[in-house]
Amino acid sequence: PRRRYTILPVPDAIAPFYTGGRGGLESCLFNTYDLPSRPLYTLTALTLHECAPGHSLQAAIAREAPGDIPEFRANNYFSGYGEGWGLYTEWLGIEMGVYDTPYEHFGRLSYEMWRAARLVIDTGLHHYGWSRERAQAYLRYNTALSEHELTTEIDRYISWPAQALSYKLGEMLIRRKRGEAESALGASFDKRYFHDTILGLRSVPLTVLEQALDQWVAAGGPDPYANAAVQ
């Protein structure tokens, strides 16, 4: 994409209660509030997720990719699709070779544990009536998040029901469909075309994403931009 992004600190007024980072079309916000309380070994995974090839790249392609797709699809955001892609890119970093040290690998694994724990915590809070303290204890015991991070995260889950579920559910779908595509297409599978097919949809519900990937496999896994005009 032609668009570029910059990395900025989270504004001081909201930083104490904000998440660790948030990617977008023009910028990636990284939370620098109380840095001693934040483990830096997660920065590689966080950058992949929020910036490139995660949210900033996805948002740029949503506005620039060719195709006869309604404009609202470029500006809408389905969390399962967007956060699923973001979490998938953390895993994709292994293939890309960007995790240089054992600490960075540990950071990615820590993030994976965190997203899996959300499935339990969100359900506990909003279906089984868990207390804030019980949710904090579960996250504390099952992840490597700092005390400051887990406190702000639990408050986020309380105030935004089900959003935290979308990360792992979306990533599980993308990785499952990739595995199916690799098995079905064999040597014809090209992960570049697989990724282009996902990102070219802009933002869609997970059911639509699954249908689109099934259709792509049935068509033989082609380059979705093979006939696109060069601009």
Where are these regions (language model features)?
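Long, His/Glu/Asp-enriched segments that create or flank divalent metal/ion-associated functional microenvironments
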Residues: 1-231
